[in-house]
Amino acid sequence: MKNTSGHREPRTRPRERDPDRRPHPDRDHHVERSRDRGGDRHRERNGDVRGNGDRRAGREQRTDRDQRQDRHRDAGHRASEQRALEKSRQSRARPEPWGPSWDAAPTPGPAPWGPRELSQKHGLGRRGLESERASERYVPTYSVPALQEEEYYQSEAEGLLDCHKCRYLCTGRACWQMLKALLNLLILACSSVSYNSTGGYTGITSLGGIYYYQYGGAYSGFDGADGERAQQLDVQFYQLKLPTVTAAMAYSGALMTFSCLTLLAGALRVPWHCPLWLVIEGLMDALIAGAYVPGLYFFFQHLSAAYSSDVCKERETLYQSKGYSGFNCGVHGGDIGAGVFAAMAIGVFAVGAVLAFRGYRKVKKLKEKPTEMLEF
């Protein structure tokens, strides 16, 4: 029913917009409609401007809209500044060979509806950028030798021993050095058999006790003049072999000591700090391998001279007359064992020389490697 009095009743004022409510992302992108334009006095008088026609309410809505637009414009300006800073930093940054850096992906710009805390995050990003630019994430120069040394030992020594000092014992050079020491120890043991006893029943009965009665003067058949003659022949034959046996023991003992010293030097990283040590070790191994050949020749030559002497033949005849057949004039097991181990040592020392020279080349290559290849 229409009002006949001609007085128009005021319309109820709409509810105010909540300032904490998140606006729709496309709120400000609508095309302004004709009924929302300012200056339409007729529609404002009739109360047709999104509310009750109140001019104050329209001004408040326009002010709120302008503040949101200014906020979006400031956020977009900060995002463009951040992207420009990222591009300039990437153009100045040094290329890294080992994979992408942490700032490979560009920082996404802030959303138009994002909160105010984005400015603080961008500030933190700038501070992190300055700290990264100062250090540039490159390995310091003083740590490069340690990395090279670690690479040298890790490439060869990945095995049972994890100790940093004992890791060298798993390398090929260390195994050959231990084998050289073992072979020289066996040569020393075989040579000491002839050195410690004069041989014959005199040497057996010198142990005393039951050995004297079982093998010695009581039941040996040597009594009187034959016993004294057998003892003299044993001592003379021992003196004939003594120089050769002594030289073999001294030679093998010195080489065993040398092998242990090279093993200890490798465990203490002397070859890394002084590569010339590897050259000296390789030359010594080659010299020792070559010296074994004439050493074996003179060893068996002097033994053959001792076994072919008149003393050895008379001694053999005397023992055979008493029924003993183990005293013939020929090389025994200890002499043969020393010769076999010496022949094996020739090949081992030759291979050790090759490994030493290869180790020298490897150390020189690692020390001359440019630092850019070790940067992460």
From Swiss-Prot:
Q: Which Pfam families match?
A: MARVEL
Output compositional bias ranges, type Basic and acidic residues: 1-95
Question: Domain MARVEL: where?
Answer: 168-361
**Among the entry's GO cellular component annotations, what is one?**
bicellular tight junction
- Which GO biological process annotations does it have? cell-cell junction organization; negative regulation of epithelial cell migration; negative regulation of epithelial cell proliferation; negative regulation of JNK cascade; protein localization to cell junction; response to osmotic stress
One GO MF annotation is: mitogen-activated protein kinase kinase kinase binding
Q: How does it sit in the membrane?
A: Multi-pass membrane protein
Ranges that cross the membrane: 174-194, 248-268, 276-296, 336-356
Q: Which UniProt keywords apply?
A: Cell junction, Membrane, Tight junction, Transmembrane, Transmembrane helix
Q: Name the organs or tissues of expression.
A: Widely expressed with highest levels in small intestine, colon, stomach and lung. Liver expresses only isoform 2.
Instruction: State its location(s).
Output: Membrane; Cell junction, Tight junction
* Extracellular side stretches: 195-247, 297-335
Which residues lie toward the Cytoplasmic compartment? 1-173, 269-275, 357-376
Q: Return the InterPro entries for the record.
A: Marvel, MARVEL_domain_protein_3
Q: Where is this region: Disordered?
A: 1-134
Q: What does this protein do?
A: As a component of tight junctions, plays a role in paracellular ion conductivity.
Q: Kindly provide the name given to this protein in its UniProt entry.
A: MARVEL domain-containing protein 3
Provenance organism: Mus musculus
Name the gene for this chain.
Marveld3
